[in-house]
Amino acid sequence: MQSTVPIAIASNGNKRDVVQNVSAGDEGDILQRLARNREMISTSLSPQKSSGFSGRRRSSSVRDALSSFFGTGNSPTSSMDDYSNLMNRNYSTASTAMCRGNSFPSDVGTKAYNITGSYQPDRHRNSVPYTTIDQLHTRQDTGLRRESDPVAAKQISSNNDIVRSFITHHASNSTMFINRVLSDYLADRGFIKQTPLYNKKSVLEISIATSAESVFLPTTKSDETEYLSLIHGSLNQARTQPVGSTNTAESDFLPSCPTMDTLNENNDLSLFPLHTQRTSPSNTARTGNAMDTSNSDRASPASNNNTTDADSFVASGNNNPMNNNNSPARNRHPNSHSRSLPNAWNSQMPSFSFALIFSLNKSTTLSDIKVELTSNVRVVWFNGLPPTKNVNEECYNIGSLDWTLNADNFNLFIPQGAKSPLDIVENHSNNRKLKVLQKLSMRKRRSFSNKAVLRENILNNLNASNSTNKLNAGVYVFTIPIVLASRIPESLYYPSARVSYSLRLATKLKDEHTQLVASRPRSSSISSPQKLRSYSCSDSYEYSQIDDTIEGETYNNDKNSTGKIAFPSSWLKSAKGRLKRNNSNGRSDNNGASSSGLAMQHDSEDTINLQYPLNLVRTPPEISVTTANKPLYINKVWENCLSYEISFAQKYVPLNGEIPITIKVAPLVKSLSVKRIRVSCREKISYRSKDYQYDFDQLDPLASDPCNPYHMRYLVRKKKDRSLPLFEVASKCTSGPSIREEVVTNTVDDNLLAYTSSKENNKDIPFSESFTVKTKLKFPKYCEVDATKAASLPPYGIDLFDPIKDPTQSENTSNNGNVLGFLVGRPNRASKTVHKIPQDKNHNEVNDTNGNSNTSLQTSSNVPIQHYTRLNKPRRGLYLDSMHFKNIQCSHKLEIVLRVSKTDSGSSKIIRHYEVIVDTPIYLISDLCNTSNIDLPTYDMATTESSKVLPPTFEEATSVSASPRSSVSYYPDDISMQQLNLSRSTSLANGYLSTLHPKTTAVSDSSNGAPIRDQQEQQARPLRTEDYALQMGNENNAYSNMDGLLSQDIFEQETAATLFKRDIVTMNFNNNIFTPRYSPRTFTNTDYNYNDNDNNDNDTEGPGPIIHPGPEPPRYDEISS
């Protein structure tokens, strides 16, 4: 009699699975074909084709068996090994009617696990965390699935030895197999590489894997939350459903839906609750060979509605657990789920997940694993915390989440001797809820004396639990997803305060061998209990040595010391930690005293206390929904004397970023001069106590300490706020240092607007014109300092600079500098490096050899500006803006200062000096929010290469001799409105112009290039943008006399660029300027005579100055002749 083996056929998610029967007589043929075609199947089942297995029924029973054993596709991470499909498998139970994928269920109904080869090709992993997806696929009658069922394996492989060899083909290297399965499991769920936390050789190794190195929080104002919810279509639905009680009074407006569970007092939120039937204890037996629990009276997680005790959850409207007894068990596909998540949650509340990996080399007993995620604030008050002022440090908690991990709620278990995917256990009964980290209200914030109390709190919670877990050798993976509210503060670092996020883990490791020795009777009748031994991750791994030294701590130590050298409190601790010796097991030999409140333990228990920091980053607002990050443009006129234009690229500036800025000043009166242009960043930091009753400014420690050597330097300043100079252009190096200094050397009377002068009554009168500065401002980032560096830094508010030497210049060893300037950090003026600017077409650009951006100085007449550059590095950078935390406020302003001198119009002729100040608020964000991280690449970056030579244009490729000139070439790097000349001079023929205007002017200028002598030479090299820019001066002159009011002699005189080469340039104003055909630009040469007859005798074929092109365009025969 032939027995039948049920095979579940995958179908659509909205339909029931269809069950077919295959006779056991065909089993041998099926398995033989399965083994022969394994390689072909692994390469042919793509994700697109694999979806067909779950979409339609296969007509062949062979294909049914193939899909049931191998799965319905390949893993997205690997298509070569069969075990790579492990992390995408959908584990089923004994009930084949409820199966989603193809499986060979065991015929033993009493087993709580069975063998399966199911694979789910499309996990629908959107922005919803994967744990909720796994909850939807959870079998409600059991949560564990053991793949290595000996009964089922015997049924499959009893008639064919090929299957036995196929299942055990990884037996040669089980370690590589385990590592590969673990890495694929984590990679499939979006985790990055593992980071080790703790290592005790031959016993236990703990590591962590996170979904991201940093968590990015959106910048969303309270009034924009409703707007975003409105455009996402979830505002009306959110308003109709009130939100349950939360643990914060300052939380965001959290939208909900009719079936969404609300927050309880533990910040426990389940976005996808399942109304499932309570399963019977008979169907929830544990796998004894996978794990064991010493506490026999602990309830099974499956019997508690698939939730653990620490993560217990009560849904709104379902407070009585007996209400769901009569509801039918359902398991829907995520796409067919009736409860949809509002889009506002996905866009405004970022998700974050982390996985804890425990690797055991032997069977070990552990206590419950306590995990906490805390957000802590530390503020050091320089004069004591009011009102008592007994303590200097204020510490409190603004948010926390906690979990309890044990042997029942793991996600994945890989035994130590795992050789195939059939040996791996994945727990689906783990219904760990998704929690939301929010900011606590002022009344619910818990204060603590110092940062050591946080360690004591988690140890007290650990000691309160007496449960133990017997864990077999292997790898245990616990995954924990969380959601962060958008209004919580990001990680902040300031001179007197910190806002940090840390993940803490605590457990007790019990050594069985030591317990047996300790249980024997001792010779002494008096036994003294040993102190508790605690191990931190900093004992073995250098990355976790977090230095939370605050500059205020060092300041208070120096203030309280009376004539003695004050060492920071953390210095002795670090020295004491370095003197500890570690044995071969990585344990410290020093048994320090236990903290207060900790229970006394025997030496057979080792307490593990680990800490992992998290970095939260605030991103700029999205440009698609708000205009907060728009560019800045200022165009104003000061006192009808000076017009200035300022453009800045953006308002949200990443630290260590370079943002372009353009400043243009134009004089409106001739008695005005600009001496200096300075760009600075003003910073203001203020702190408030936890109850908002007391506050102080970051500059108060310096202002209230007359013994500080920088106190007088601070008092003489006009503005007390900190101002970090970023850029400066001046004619003399008389002011303080800046990060980038441009000193102009060829000005007239130290006026940045005048570079030429004219003679009037035997007196040089400067000729003022508009002046434009184009550069990139660099905003330096702060440096995290320890106790040693904090003592060497100047106090906040005093900025010192270190000069950056030019490697191309020889080092100057002159010691003629000022001693006082050396002591306060001023650079030596005698050792300044002068950058000589060559007189070429790029004379207005400075190539910085130190990697900084170029600076362009231009005038309206294109006069060559000679200047040199000095670079300095500040010892203290700028800090982040704080906009989402009222207790710590930090703001910045970009300030542009114009130093202006103006002569009175009266008879006194008194020169008065002014400072025109223009400031605008900016926001400094993290350096991780640079353009390469938050912006998409441009089309040019994706399609072109920087080193690739561009092909010629159509006109350049098809042009012949005597044809019209080619159009201006387009380069993305040289976009400017000045390059787009709309005149017809570029398309007029040379012959036609020479017939109208036989007299041409030969221009000889080094900056504008040589004149065109032959049209054949011009056609040999196509006209480029740089060539076209050099001829704009002549073309502008061609249309400057269209009305015929100016004299024709203007075109027979020298050009301004030629006269600018001389040492003395004068202008004669004795003639009448209103004479017909007279040009005001008649220059007088006092050094040598310039003969204009040479230009009249030379017949040039190039285009001359165009006065009027005529009423009609030229004909083709005129052009080609």
Swiss-Prot record:
Phosphorylated by CDC28. The modification Phosphoserine is found at S23, S46, S127, S327, S987. The keyword Repressor applies. GO terms for biological process: fungal-type cell wall organization; regulation of transcription by RNA polymerase II; ubiquitin-dependent endocytosis. GO terms for cellular component: cytoplasm; cytosol; nucleus. The keyword Cytoplasm applies. This is Transcription factor CSR2. It comes from Saccharomyces cerevisiae (strain ATCC 204508 / S288c). The lineage of its organism: Eukaryota, Fungi, Dikarya, Ascomycota, Saccharomycotina. The gene is CSR2.
